[in-house]
Design a protein with these regions (language model features):
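C-terminal motif of bacterial Sec signal peptides marking the signal peptidase cleavage site
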Residues: 14-17
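Sec-dependent N-terminal signal peptides
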Residues: 6-9
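Positively charged n-region of N-terminal signal peptides that target proteins for export
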Residues: 1-4
């Protein structure tokens, strides 16, 4: 009987050890969750602004998906542009979208002094619900300020919350405002948020990130170069390095003397 109890206790210890090992593996993945969630949100914001700029260029043309509605066309007050993808998913630029992007604005997209305030109504990209407020101000013809306020991305594995302030300097494409695919921006700023596992984080762009919109012609990602430091709560800093190999969605994250490749979908 004693032998049986001993063997059973050894079995329990062995089982406990296996369980502990399985618990440790997800923790290691969670260490990169903030990095993954931030990179996902950055990519989705870039796609939102591609849709918005398309809307300002093509709002007078009839399209099935999306449709454009321009309201209050009065030069003395703000106008409203509704970019409507409908209630069912439709495909735009390789992304499934539904719902509405709603922009109120006082001037056109690239006009100095313009302020474009963006909200959402049941808007999804690839079945990720996006809510909150984005405000893009054109400080002059080449400099833009993006304020991200109370923005959330509801995914299958949790909610990502994002707030921040980014400065975008256009370094190419100034002379072709109706062809955004030759635009290149240098981006600086700070981001804070909560990842889908509930852990908070802060982002500091340490080396300006290059957004090359010509990459949209062959990829769903436009980040070409630059670096950002991400500080998740209770974890060491991670260094995000863009521009792994041209117009792709491969991004390197360095932490704790280790290098991890994150590939965005």
């Amino acid at each position: 009987m004693k032998k049986t109890i001993l063997f059973f206790n050894i079995f329990l210890l062995s089982l406990s050890s296996c369980v502990d090992e399985k618990v440790l593996n997800p923790v290691e993945q969670i260490n990169l969750q903030s990095s993954r969630d931030y990179l996902l949100s950055e990519n989705l914001f870039n796609h939102i602004y591609r849709s918005i700029e398309e809307g300002f260029i093509y709002n007078g043309q009839a399209k099935n998906c999306p449709s454009y509605t321009l309201l209050n066309q009065n030069i003395n007050n703000s106008d409203t542009l509704i970019i409507d993808f409908g209630e069912e998913n439709c495909l735009q630029f390789g992304q499934l979208k539904r719902g509405q992007i709603i922009c109120t604005f006082n001037e056109k997209y690239h006009t100095s002094g313009s302020i474009i305030n963006t909200t959402f109504s049941q808007f999804y990209i690839n079945n990720i619900l996006i809510e909150g407020n984005l405000e893009l101000s054109c400080l002059d013809n080449n400099l833009y300020q993006l304020e991200i306020s109370n923005t959330s991305l509801t995914t299958n594995y949790g909610v990502i919350n994002i707030n921040g302030s980014l400065e975008k300097q256009m370094i190419n494409g100034q002379n072709s405002i109706y062809n955004y695919l030759d635009d290149i921006y240098l981006v600086n700023g700070n981001i804070s948020g909560n990842s889908s596992n509930g852990n908070s984080f802060d982002i500091l762009i340490s080396d300006p990130i290059t957004y090359d919109l010509s990459c949209f012609q062959s990829s769903s990602c436009i980040t070409q170069s630059g670096q950002a430091i991400i500080t998740p709560n209770n974890y060491e800093n991670r260094l995000i390095k863009y521009g792994f190999s041209g117009c792709d969605c491969d991004i390197i994250v360095e932490y704790n003397n280790e290098t991890t490749l994150i590939v965005l979908d």
